[in-house]
């Protein structure tokens, strides 16, 4: 474990009225080697801040033609003073009012999930961070928006928030004859996008994955990874429920005052440490469009040899699972019409409920539920296949507590405009440069390989191994399975080459670890090329 020292920069914290100005100066350190396998993590801060005095003048600010808020520094239109809303974010627009002229006479709710939609998102970890947009700012607007007889107030930043009609709860079932197929088509969709690299622009709307650092992410990895390079087959079922579509205004956004002040304090002289702290606290991107709702998915892991002994096919399992949800096992004739005997279907369904038997067909039931957070629903979901009643209960909960399941995003630096910030082009360019450094620093490629197909996760200055069920130890080195195939994993990207012919390139190697004992090679490109100038 080690930190590399680096020089810092000076950033202004100007106090008007003094002959000299108080500034802050910083220095920071980069992570050279994370700790792992019980090594000591870095036990000191990777940055230092102290006051300094200089005769350098304060950085100029964007001129405000309206009212300058006392604490937040926000510039608001004077027509918003004394209207009963906290337009400043610090109530200074409502101070010293002889009379309050309330724009809204009735209480109105906030849109479901609107707080998360205003947050920045770290796409390297799929985690929501601090607020970058102010979705409690209405600019005096008060037209009610009715959804299911509930009156909502539309924030100034929001272009549209459209409810979606709740349809039937239907599962789409797909089967996979090997873990490698299952991982490529299913598991990798839930992973965070730590490897994206096309200028940090994400084209189109995409599904938001599960953070491998979250409890749910770790649980899912442990339960599914144990079946890598086994003779198991997989039946994956998924039901999507959309309750609302969200779209942000394309321009003239009201930034959250905390984010506004942090960006104003960034040094114009490039210093990675301060920009890194911004990404840590506010994420790497912000959401421009989103689908809110829920995803209910489960995976049945079946023992292929046990299925053959019992004269079962994957199609039999597929038919029994699909139709048990529809009829709840009540109409025996339906199974016969599917070409599956009642006894066969009962055998499969009973094994799902009692997975403590030895040498059974059903090796595991792995469930992942997003949206409709409820301890009661989650407990039921992890015990058995979903029923119509459970899905109805889950759907009702999703309506009022939806998850953000799909997003369209823009890099955080796109919020830095000349409307709010002086020297915006300089700050924006610094943020672009820092984002590339940040991606390198937080990548788990810095971790030593975990054994037994364990998954390394870098958190802070420490690497941990998420071990498949059946493996344990700091490096997943204790396992009942011997000489198993080891899948290859990528090492870190090299630095970009210098710009030549308006192109630059970088490479990486599949050696962390390399494939062993017939394991799968790394997926994805070994080199990348980008335009440059």
PLM regions: where:
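Thrombospondin type-1
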Residues: 1-75, 86, 90-103, 358-365, ...
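Membrane-permeabilization and membrane-interfacing ectodomains
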Residues: 99-451, 457
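A generic hydrophobic-helix recognition signal that picks specific residues
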Residues: 76-77, 334
């Amino acid at each position: 474990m080690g930190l590399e020292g680096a020089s810092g920069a000076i950033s202004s914290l100007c106090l008007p009225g003094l002959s000299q100005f108080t500034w802050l100066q910083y220095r920071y350190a980069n992570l050279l080697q994370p700790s792992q396998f019980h090594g000591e993590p870095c036990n000191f801060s990777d940055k230092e801040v102290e006051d300094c005095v200089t005769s350098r003048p304060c950085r100029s600010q964007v001129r405000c033609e309206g009212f300058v808020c006392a604490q937040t520094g926000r510039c608001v239109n004077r027509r918003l003073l004394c209207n009963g809303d906290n337009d400043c974010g610090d109530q200074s627009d409502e101070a010293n009012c002889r009379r309050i002229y309330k724009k809204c006479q009735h209480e109105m709710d906030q849109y479901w999930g609107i707080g998360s939609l205003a947050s920045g998102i770290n796409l390297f970890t799929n985690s929501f961070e601090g607020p970058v947009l102010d979705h409690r700012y209405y600019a005096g607007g008060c037209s009610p928006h009715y959804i299911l007889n509930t009156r909502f107030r539309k924030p100034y930043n929001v272009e549209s928030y459209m409810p979606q009609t709740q349809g039937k709860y239907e599962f789409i079932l797909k089967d996979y004859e090997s873990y490698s197929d299952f991982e490529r088509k299913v598991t990798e969709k839930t992973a965070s996008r730590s490897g994206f690299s096309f200028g940090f622009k994400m084209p189109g709307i995409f599904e938001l994955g599960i953070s491998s650092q979250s409890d749910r992410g770790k649980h899912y990895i442990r339960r599914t990874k144990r079946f890598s390079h086994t003779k198991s087959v997989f039946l994956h079922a998924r039901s999507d429920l959309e309750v609302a579509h969200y779209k942000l205004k394309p321009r003239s956004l009201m930034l959250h005052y905390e984010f506004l002040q942090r960006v104003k304090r960034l040094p114009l002289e490039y210093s990675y440490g301060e920009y890194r702290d911004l990404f840590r606290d506010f994420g790497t991107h912000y959401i421009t469009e989103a689908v809110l709702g829920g995803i209910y998915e489960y995976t049945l892991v079946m023992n292929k040899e046990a299925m053959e002994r019992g004269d079962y096919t994957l199609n039999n399992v597929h038919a029994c699972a699909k139709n048990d949800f529809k009829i709840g096992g009540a109409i025996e004739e339906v199974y016969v019409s599917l070409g599956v005997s009642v006894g066969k279907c009962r055998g499969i369904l009973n094994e799902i409920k009692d997975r403590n038997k030895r040498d059974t067909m059903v090796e595991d039931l792995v469930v992942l539920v997003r949206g409709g957070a409820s301890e009661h629903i989650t407990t039921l979901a992890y015990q058995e296949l979903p029923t119509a009643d459970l899905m109805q209960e889950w759907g009702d909960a999703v309506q009022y507590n939806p998850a953000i399941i799909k997003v369209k995003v823009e890099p955080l630096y796109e919020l830095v405009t000349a409307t709010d910030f002086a020297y915006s082009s300089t700050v924006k360019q610094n943020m672009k440069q820092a984002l590339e450094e940040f991606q390198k620093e937080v990548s788990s490629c810095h971790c030593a390989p975990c054994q037994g197909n364990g998954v390394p996760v870098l958190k802070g200055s420490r690497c941990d191994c998420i071990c498949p069920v059946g493996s344990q130890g700091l490096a997943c080195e204790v396992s009942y399975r011997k000489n198993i195939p080891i899948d290859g994993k990528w090492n870190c990207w090299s630095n970009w080459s210098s710009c030549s012919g308006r192109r630059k390139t970088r490479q990486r190697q599949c050696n962390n670890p390399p494939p062993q004992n017939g394991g799968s090679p790394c997926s994805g490109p070994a080199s990348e090329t980008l335009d440059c100038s």
